[in-house]
């Protein structure tokens, strides 16, 4: 149902949405987000001076792992069979920003929007964690759903992707 808080019952108590009568369909979702790095962090990342390993690859791995664990992190999120995750972190030396995208696909009774958003969020948090020893001057921003397909509510596409 649109227009209501579907995870609350009539008394306002939390509940998991009943999906028992829904048919499996192909579902996709794409989310994006940014980490803006302070000058010192950006310079050291551009120079490959991380002592903890490849920051972007580790963030990508963390984001993929998070997609698979979304129902453990979001209490009322259904566990679904993830069929594909494509998570990418790209660093712009000119802006000092890391652009993160996460695309998720499944064939199930509920969508994968939360999984895509969780992947981006955890990848961004991993960048922060790996770089905070240099400086806390970082901003995580712009995490949003770019698109989704499948399901009763139909397709969705946000306007104005910000990719650099």
Could you tell me what each predicted segment is?
Residues 1-56, 61-164:
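C-terminal binding/interaction regions
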């Amino acid at each position: 149902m649109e227009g209501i808080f579907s995870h609350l019952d009539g008394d306002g108590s939390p509940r998991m949405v009943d999906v028992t009568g829904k048919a499996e369909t192909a579902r996709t979702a794409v989310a994006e987000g940014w980490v803006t790095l302070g000058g010192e962090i950006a310079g050291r990342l551009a120079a490959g001076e991380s002592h903890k390993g490849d920051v972007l690859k580790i963030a990508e791995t963390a984001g993929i792992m998070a997609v698979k664990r979304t129902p453990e992190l979001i209490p009322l999120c259904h566990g679904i069979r993830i069929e594909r995750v494509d998570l990418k972190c790209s660093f712009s030396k000119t802006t000092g920003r890391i652009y993160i995208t996460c695309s998720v696909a499944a064939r199930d009774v509920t969508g994968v929007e939360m999984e895509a958003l969780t992947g981006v969020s955890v990848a961004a948090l991993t960048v922060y964690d790996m770089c905070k020893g240099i400086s806390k001057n970082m901003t995580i921003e712009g995490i949003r759903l770019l698109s989704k397909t499948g399901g009763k509510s139909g397709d969705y596409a946000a306007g104005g992707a910000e990719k650099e």
